[in-house]
C-alpha cells in the first residue's frame, strides 16, 4: 500500500540467532505474532515462517524486503539497539545491515537510538545518509541506561561526530530547544509516530517529514 501510494517506508531491523537482519520492530514476538519468545533466539529461516497478526505475511529478511522495494520509494532503516544499554558494544547487526545497504540501488537512509551503531555504519557504508532517533531518554523507557548516558543522548552530543544529517524525534518532544537548534543548523527533522491528520498538521509546523500509521495523509511529505 505504501509503495502504491508513493509513501516512503520506515522499517526496524533486528538480528536473528544466525546473524541475519530481519524486518521487525519488537525484541519479542508476542505482540505482533501468534508466537512468543525472542527474535534473537530463532534463526532467520524460522522467523520467515512466523505469520504476523492480522494477515498472511511473515517476518521478512532485510535483503528480501529491499529486493521487493527495489528503489520504488525511499526507505528509512532503523537499527534496533541490541542490548538495551545504548552503549558501545559491537554487534553483528551493523555489518550485516550495511552489507545489504551497500548493494542497494535506491533512496535509503539509516538511523538508530544508539549513536555508536551509526558511527559504525559511517565506517562500513559512508555513502549511506545517517541520522539519530531521539526521545526524552527517560529512566522509565531506558532502565538499562545510566543517568549520565541518558543525559548525554538527550543533549544530542553525538550528532556531528557520526556525520548525521537528520534526526527523528518523538512527537511529544518536538518543542525542545535542542531540536530548534538542530533545525537552525540545517538538520532535517523527522518525527514519530503520528497517528492522525490532526497530529500531522501540528507536527509539520516544526518538522520536514513524519512517520505515520493508522491513517492516510493528504500528501507524501
Which residues does each predicted region cover?
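Anion (oxyanion) recognition and catalysis
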Residues: 3, 102, 122, 183-184, ...
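Short, glycine/acidic-enriched loop or turn micro-motifs at the edges of active sites
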Residues: 13-15, 28-29, 81, 196
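C-terminal active-site rim and adjoining tail of enzyme catalytic domains
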Residues: 133, 141-221
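Catalytic domains of carbohydrate-active enzymes, especially glycoside hydrolases
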Residues: 1-15, 161-165
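Active-site flanking residues adjacent to catalytic metal/cofactor-binding acidic residues
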Residues: 9-11, 24-25, 77, 212
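Metal-dependent phosphodiesterase/phospholipase catalytic core, i.e.
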Residues: 25-137, 160-165, 169-171
Amino acid at each position: 500500500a505504501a509503495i502504491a501510494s508513493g509513501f516512503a517506508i520506515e522499517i526496524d531491523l533486528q538480528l536473528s540467532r544466525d546473524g541475519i537482519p530481519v524486518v521487525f520492530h519488537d525484541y519479542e514476538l508476542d505482540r505482533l505474532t501468534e508466537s512468543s519468545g525472542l527474535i534473537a533466539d530463532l534463526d532467520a529461516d524460522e522467523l520467515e515462517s512466523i505469520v504476523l497478526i492480522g494477515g498472511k505475511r511473515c517476518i521478512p529478511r532485510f535483503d528480501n524486503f529491499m529486493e521487493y522495494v527495489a528503489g520504488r520509494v525511499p526507505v528509512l532503516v532503523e537499527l534496533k539497539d541490541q542490548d538495551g544499554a545504548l552503549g558501545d558494544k559491537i554487534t553483528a547487526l551493523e555489518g550485516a545491515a550495511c552489507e545489504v545497504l551497500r548493494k542497494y540501488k535506491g533512496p535509503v537512509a539509516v538511523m538508530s537510538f544508539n549513536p555508536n551503531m551509526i558511527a559504525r555504519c559511517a565506517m562500513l557504508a559512508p555513502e549511506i545518509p545517517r541520522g539519530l532517533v531521539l526521545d526524552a531518554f527517560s529512566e522509565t523507557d531506558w532502565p538499562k541506561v545510566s543517568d549520565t548516558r541518558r543525559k548525554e543522548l538527550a543533549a544530542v552530543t553525538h550528532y556531528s561526530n557520526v556525520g548525521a544529517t537528520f534526526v527523528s524525534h518523538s512527537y511529544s518532544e518536538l518543542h525542545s530547544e535542542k531540536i530548534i537548534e538542530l533545525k537552525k543548523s540545517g538538520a532535517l527533522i523527522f518525527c514519530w509516530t503520528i497517528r492522525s491528520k490532526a497530529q500531522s498538521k501540528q507536527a509539520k509546523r516544526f518538522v520536514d517529514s513524519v512517520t505515520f500509521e493508522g491513517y492516510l495523509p493528504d500528501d507524501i511529505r
